[in-house]
From Swiss-Prot:
Descriptive protein name: dTDP-4-dehydrorhamnose 3-epimerase
Residue numbers binding substrate: 23, 28, 47-49, 59, 72, 119, 143, 167
Family named by the database record: Belongs to the dTDP-4-dehydrorhamnose 3,5-epimerase family.
Record-marked site positions (Participates in a stacking interaction with the thymidine ring of dTDP-4-oxo-6-deoxyglucose): 138
Organism listed in the record: Streptomyces niveus
Domain of life: Bacteria
């Protein structure tokens, strides 16, 4: 398993070591010790979710108040998605920036995002199943969304006509969410997280 920090602080890409033989494949997609060594703290598991989507579905951009905040560890166990993280932390050097990563059932990579980072994805296979571990339980009173098609974010979704839920369709734009005081601040998020080590890959290379 190798962990690589992405361009937004607090976001990591995890590449597992896959062991294949004629029977199939086995892998560790989460390892508490290697994760904590890279990130600087373990993931406090509070809830695990599965999301099944058909091609063209876009979900997001979702985020949780900080505090309490919610970190996520996301992988695709069937099909493929274009997974997107957005820095929603007001005052962050990368505020308003996004990064996209292909998650699928071939590479079986995962993405970790810390508190204050928005999350969304687009299903790019006929059906895609996303599995994610969360550090907090779902509470509709603390969860919010930014419109995934906000022109200020300019996310390059790999679909011509995205399928959105009514909730995501009615979500605020980034500027509206900021003006409404809904976005977390970088300082508040820093107070609830442990600083990450310097950029570089962490983990064993495998046999």
């Amino acid at each position: 398993m190798r962990l690589r920090p992405l361009g937004i602080e607090g976001v990591w890409e995890i590449t597992p070591e896959q062991r294949a033989d004629p029977r199939g494949v086995f892998l560790d997609w989460y390892h508490v010790d290697r994760f904590a060594e890279a990130i600087g703290r373990p993931l406090r598991l509070a809830q695990a979710n599965l999301s099944v989507s058909v091609r063209g579905v876009v979900r997001g951009i979702h985020f949780v108040d900080v505090p309490p905040g919610q970190a996520k560890y996301v992988t695709c166990v069937r099909g493929a998605v274009f997974d997107v993280v957005v820095d929603l932390r007001v005052g962050s050097p990368t505020y308003g920036c996004w990064e996209g990563t292909r998650l699928d059932d071939v590479s079986r990579r995962a993405v970790y995002l810390s508190e204050g980072i928005g999350h969304g994805f687009c299903a790019i296979s006929d059906e895609a199943t996303l599995c994610y571990l969360s550090s907090g339980t779902y509470d509709p009173a603390t969860e919010h969304g930014v419109h995934p098609l906000d022109p200020e974010l300019a996310i390059d979704w790999p679909t011509g006509t995205p399928l959105l839920s009514p909730r995501d369709q009615d979500a605020l734009l980034l500027a509206e969410a900021r003006d409404a005081g809904l976005l977390p601040t970088y300082a508040t998020c820093q107070a609830v997280t442990v600083p990450s080590p310097a950029p570089g890959s962490v983990g064993d290379p495998g046999p």
